[in-house]
Amino acid sequence: MAGRNWLDTFGRAKSLDVNADLDRGYEAALLIQSLELEYYGDRPIRPDLELSVPSSVQATVLRKFRAAISVCRASLDKLEYQRGELDPQELRQLQLIESVVNRYSPRRTASAPTISRSPDPLPRSLLGIFDTLRRQLNPTAEATLVAGFRRRRDSTLISLKVLLLLILVPLLVQQVSRTYIISPAVDRYAPDLPFLSYPKPQLEEQAVEKLRVYKAEIEFDALLRGDSIPTQEELQKKLSAKAEELKQEADSESTHAVKNVIADLAATVAFVVVCVFSREELRVLRGFFDEAVYGLSDSAKAFAIILFTDIFVGFHSPEGWTVLLDGIANHFGFPARENFILLFIATFPVILATIFKYWIFRYLNRVSPSSVATLRGMNGGG
């Protein structure tokens, strides 16, 4: 049993090393691609090419490139013999690292100026078949596949666990702290600290309207029953009691915003604490989301994109933004200004749509052209 536990611990440590090497290499490859796209027009980086930027900026770019390509090569050397343990998403990340390393390999750079090169002794596809057979006939192939399955299973369980923690811990902290700590403390010190129950004009207007309706209801009930309308003294007494009740209700509502703000701050602190103590799990969660997203078909990706854009920047999105802004204003105790809401609806969805189209043009069109083509077809060719 002790030997099995030691082997499990060693396997988990090895899995973490593989994930760390893959993440470092993948981030370095993405950095190189971003440098190519930003400074070299989506072409390979050439140290001998003079850019139309200051020399200090070009030196920084080349320094980042050299550091990133060295990280990619080191990661590729370490991951070369771990292919069987990688899931499809990790294999795609490894292929990206390989493509970047091959693009800047010395052999490729040296042979770039030539028009043709000597043919390989054997076709690459035939070599790939031999390599596949070699891996399948390897005595450790079954153990490698089982280790890869266990690692993917552990990755899924860790991702679900940290996702539940990120959702439930801040929510529970917010509700429990607001109910048992913040609300009693604010109610206790609100009479002595005026800023905890600052006056709100909209609450006063609502109280006046409720008092006017209450007076009309008294007179209407008296007329329905056939009784005489209450005298001025009786009406004044009832209105005074109702006004006191409305005042207490307004005072209670005026502290809700302060309670909500403090409870939200406590939830934010809890969220940050969970993130700080779950950094390794968050990296696993990011890989899980990447695998889920990239594992979708092109039609599913296009459908999700169209659904997202129609909800937030589509024809019916102004109604949703209005409800959302009203809820946020009520949560924090701000008056719902119609002019601000209309200005927000007229500008923010447009900015969001522009950012989204730019993302499609710069990133999605290069990473998944088939998804862009499917998106255009489902969107009516636009």
UniProtKB/Swiss-Prot annotation:
First-listed, main subcellular location of the protein, grouped into a coarse class: membrane
Residue ranges of the TM segments: 156-176, 257-277, 305-325, 340-360
Organism of derivation: Synechococcus sp. (strain WH7803)
Gene Ontology molecular function: proton transmembrane transporter activity
Subcellular location: Cell inner membrane
Keywords of this entry: Cell inner membrane, Cell membrane, Hydrogen ion transport, Ion transport, Membrane, Transmembrane, Transmembrane helix, Transport
Family the UniProt entry places it in: Belongs to the CemA family.
InterPro entries the UniProt entry points to: CemA
Functional summary from the UniProt entry: Required for H(+) efflux immediately after light irradiation to form a rapid H(+) concentration gradient across the thylakoid membranes. Together with PxcL, contributes to transient H(+) uptake following dark to light transition.
GO cellular component: plasma membrane
Pfam families associated with the record: CemA
Mode of membrane association: Multi-pass membrane protein
Protein's recorded name: Proton extrusion protein PxcA
Highest taxon of the lineage: Bacteria
